Design a protein with these regions (language model features):
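Short loop/turn segments immediately following the C-termini of beta-strands
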Residues: 86-89, 137-140, 148, 186-189, ...
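Repeated scaffold domains used in trafficking and secretory/extracellular systems
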Residues: 67-76, 114-128, 166-175, 216-227, ...
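Conserved beta-propeller blade signature
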Residues: 82-85, 133-137, 181-185, 229-232, ...
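Surface-exposed loop and turn segments in beta-propeller and other repeat-based domains
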Residues: 111-118, 159-166, 215, 251-268, ...
Length: 376
């Protein structure tokens, strides 16, 4: 019997520093930059847990710089330089920023193509590779590796080092697998009725292979990888894929309760969680997401190998309406999720209508805790 503790709070840090001796993290992906800082969710497995030290509980000195943009993606390479993908408040155009790690002042910027359908497409879910290059798929469907350099004059520049057309625009999820293939998921299908596309580009063969999800299924979060495969959460189901001789192979699929509609504070009609691998032994024997059940969402924990649901528990034990638009912090036997119900966020273009429509109909969630015991 394995015990998985799920703790849910009204506010939650995006990353948790852990005791490296006591807990097991997913194995580092050699095609990605430093664990903890090379991607939005800490590592290829999206566990949001790192051995890096936090600020501590004492007084800290804070340095800030104002921008007319929102910065969801802030990454740091092995050289300590900060690379970020930000979206302008005015027109939602994405930009790459190279930031001074001491002052946070911009050293160089690069404008990216803006997606016509999703603010999450076009580079928001990007990562640093093992050469400190930013890897993204722009809104035109080009897989780019962007490096930075300093000239003799002291000025810095961002440079597109390589470009490969993968043929699929509006990519929202991006992650390398443990053999170096770059996996992606599109926001929606290539036609009005087809599902989103999951695929990968293989640098060894210079080929792109793809798999189309069932009709109507979209992807609104990033994707994750471990030695067992690549996890994708659509607006209807959780999947695990591996590469095959002719392209992506679906190992398993499990549909979850997506509820009657999109909830206020969430980007899509479906799960708000990027799948997270975790576990006490290998660091990836479990997978977790939340569903979109009404009124209470549930934390779901799956066996990575079989795809069987080994545990489910309501998001809050009080019966309060609940919602989540964030990946888990998952490590060992513990899972942490933030409650984001009715948080004011810019409405996603082409998002499904939200229900209930009035934010005040949702209760405030703070300090509630629940625990889950799962057999396995």
């Amino acid at each position: 019997m394995k015990t998985i503790a799920g703790c849910f709070f009204g506010t939650c840090a995006l990353l948790v520093a852990i005791d490296a001796v006591a807990q097991t993290l997913p194995p580092a992906n050699s095609f990605m930059g430093p664990p903890g800082t090379a991607t939005m969710h800490a590592n290829a497995a999206s566990s949001n847990a790192t051995t890096n030290r936090g600020p501590g509980a004492g007084a800290v000195s804070i340095t800030g710089t104002s921008f007319d943009a929102v910065f969801p993606t802030i990454l740091m390479g092995s050289d300590g330089m900060i690379v970020s993908v930000a979206t302008k408040w005015t027109d939602r155009t994405p930009y790459v920023y190279l930031l001074n790690p001491a002052t946070l002042e911009p050293l160089a910027t690069m404008r990216l193509f803006k997606s016509a359908i999703s603010d999450m497409a076009g580079g928001i879910y990007s990562y640093l590779d093992n050469d400190n290059r930013l890897v993204l798929v722009n809104a035109e469907g080009d897989l780019e590796r962007i490096s930075y350099s300093q000239q003799s004059s002291g000025t810095w520049s961002l440079n597109v080092e390589s470009t490969v057309s993968i043929g699929y625009p509006d990519v929202v999820g991006l992650v390398p697998d443990y053999q170096g293939r770059v996996w992606f998921a599109t926001a929606q299908g290539t036609s009005g009725t087809s599902g989103a596309v999951v695929g990968y580009y293989d640098p060894a063969t210079n080929r792109t292979s793809a798999y189309t999800l069932p009709a109507g299924e979209q992807v609104a979060n990033s994707i994750s990888s471990s030695p067992s495969g690549v996890a994708v959460a659509s607006t209807s189901a959780l999947y695990l894929f591996q590469s095959g001789s002719s392209g992506p192979v679906q190992l398993w699929r499990d549909a979850y309760d997506r509820g009657p509609a999109r909830k206020p504070g969430q980007l899509s009609w479906g799960t708000g969680a990027t799948p997270a691998f975790f576990g006490p032994n290998t660091g990836y024997e479990y997978l977790t997401i939340t569903d979109n059940a009404y009124p209470q969402e549930n934390i779901l924990v799956y066996n990575t190998t079989s795809g069987s649901l080994i545990g489910s528990v309501p998001f809050l034990i009080s019966g309060t309406n609940s919602g989540n638009e964030d990946a888990a912090i998952a490590v060992g036997n513990s899972v942490y999720y933030p409650v984001t119900t009715a948080i004011s966020i810019p409405s996603r273009r082409r998002a499904a209508p939200a229900f209930p429509h009035r934010r005040r109909s949702w209760g405030a969630c703070s300090g509630s805790t629940c625990c889950l015991t799962a057999g396995g």
